[in-house]
Amino acid sequence: MRVLVYILFSISFVFSQWFEINYGGISRSYYVAYPPSSSEPSGLIINMHGFGGTASGQIAVTQMNNYAHPQNLAVVYPQGSASGIGTSSWNIGTFWDFNDQDDVGFISAMIDEIASNFQINLNKIYACGFSNGGYMSYELACELSDKITAFGSVSGNFMLNS
């Protein structure tokens, strides 16, 4: 029994782990949770935290892996960058421009990096988020329409850049 528990515990680390990518001169991190029993390319859900949140917090609060993995969907939880007021956020322009990072470019590069390391169905890439992460899902749907298949937002509405 101990051996089985050890094997199952070890397998979860193979399919779920933190990654870093250097984008815009800074190190950016994201957590990928890939379905452990996938035999064909998986879809990808980008699940973004709200203002002041963290990728780790988004994992814990949403528990999206439990729902995504049985549907052959991987989930990535990117970490927003530090804002000018010392808390993490997504730069979507408008009144949410608390940081000067190119978050759309970061997410695009992250998608490319994940697709090069995992079997991802590039026709099934979805964006979702809470609050500031929800605003970011709208931004990605507009700015990365060549990559994002569909999106959803919780407590974040569409803002027009002026």
Predicted region positions:
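Active-site glycine-rich loops that stabilize anionic/oxyanionic intermediates
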Residues: H49-T54
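Sec-dependent N-terminal signal peptides
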Residues: V3-S16
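A domain-start/cap signature at the N-terminus of enzymes
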Residues: V14-L44, S56-T62, N66, P70, ...
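Alpha/beta-hydrolase active-site loop
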Residues: W96-Q119, E139
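Generic enzyme active-site microenvironment
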Residues: N47, Y77
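A general structural-boundary detector
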Residues: V3, F19, A55, G93-T94
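Cap/lid segment of the alpha/beta-hydrolase catalytic domain
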Residues: Q79-D102
